Every structure is written in structure tokens, then in C-alpha cells.
Amino acid sequence: MELIDVLESTYTCRYYKEDEVEEEKLKRVLSAARWGPSGGNRQPVSLIVVRDKDKKSALQDLYLPLWEPYVRGIEQGDIKISARNSRMLQAADHFARNLANVPVLIQICARLEDVHPTDIELDRLSIVGGASVYPAVQNILLSARNEGLGSALTTLLCTVEYDVKKLLEIPDDVSTAAMLTLGYPVNKFPSKLNRKPIEDMCWNETFGRNFF
């Protein structure tokens, strides 16, 4: 595939076939993570591939209690969503309740001593540390699309990091950063994703000054 076609059609896949992902294809997808940049080339990212049914079920059991309060809030009218988001909610709910049936789960980990954010002294949430982690994650997502595989990124399980670390025997000095799902999609890939135009996000010299 052309790179631009991969970029424009890598979507969040929430419906998966139960077909296994071939070993060689999986290896190529995972290997793409190695080429993500990191500060000082410290390469803090590590991956745990989970295909064992019991472990996937245990991860689903951790995921659902975090997800269900959001659904209840919508059902009770406490959280308002649009009709479009209502369709997305249905897909996300299916995803949450079928996590154990996804062929491959990939736990993304990072060794924090190799992540050196430069914004921790600012009076806001630190975001810079992710620059050494999430490029590797994006590489996996794009590589999966190139191989005809669907994928999704979720960070919800980071809320229960202790339990995830215990289940997957993650060392004390390694933290959880995300979990990816991987498999053959039930639905066709979109030809192009719905994104805001470049004119709404790219500025000339100063913020808000039109570039285009």
C-alpha cells in the first residue's frame, strides 16, 4: 500500500473475526515498533503479546468494570451523546464485552527511567513523556493496516495498572502505557477517515493565523 493510503484508512477496529493472525505477519507488525523515535534513543517501550484465552478473559474482566459506569451514565441521561456517537458507543460496548475473543492483545509497556519528560515543572498535565512511547504504538497500528489487520488503542486498563502488572508479571520498574487489539476486521476498511481539514489545525508563524 502507499503510505498515504495507510494513514487515511487506519481506523479503530472494534469488530474482529476470530481467525488467527499468522506468525510471520504478526512478527512484521510487532517489529515496526522498533523504529519509533524516542528521546536519546533510549527505547523504553516493550510489548507483551497476549493470546492465551484465560489471560484475555482476565483482561476483559478488568476492563468491563471501568467501562460499564460510562454506559450507565449515558443510559441514565447523565452523559449526553450525539446520534453519531451513539453508533460509536454500540461498537465500543461490543468491543468491551468481546475483548477476550480478539485474536491478539498487545500490552504496551515503558520503563520510566528511560523516559525523561521536559515539562514536569509546568503547571499543567505532563505530556512530553509520551513522545518516547506512542510513536512506537502508531508504527504498530500503521503496520497492522498495511498487513490487512484491524487494530484499536485503549488506555483504560492503565487505571488498574497494579492488576495488569500482576496478571502479566510486569516488573516494578516498568509501567503500562496502553493496550492494543489486533486481528482481521469483520467490516471493510474505510477508504478515508473522517477528520477535520488541515486548515483547522495548521497555522502560519503564530497560532490562529491561517497558513492555507
Name what the model sees in each region.
Residues 1-101, 210-212:
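N-terminal amphipathic, basic helical "cap/leader" segment at the start of enzyme domains
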Residues 5-6, 12-13, 176-212:
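C-terminal helix-cap and adjacent tail motif
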Residues 52-57, 65, 112-113, 162, ...:
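Short, charged/polar surface micro-motifs in flexible loops or helix N-caps
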Residues 68-79, 167-192:
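A glycine-rich helix N-cap at a beta->alpha junction
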Residues 94-97, 166-170:
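A generic local secondary-structure boundary/capping motif
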Residues 101-104, 149, 172-176:
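Short coil/turn connectors at secondary-structure junctions
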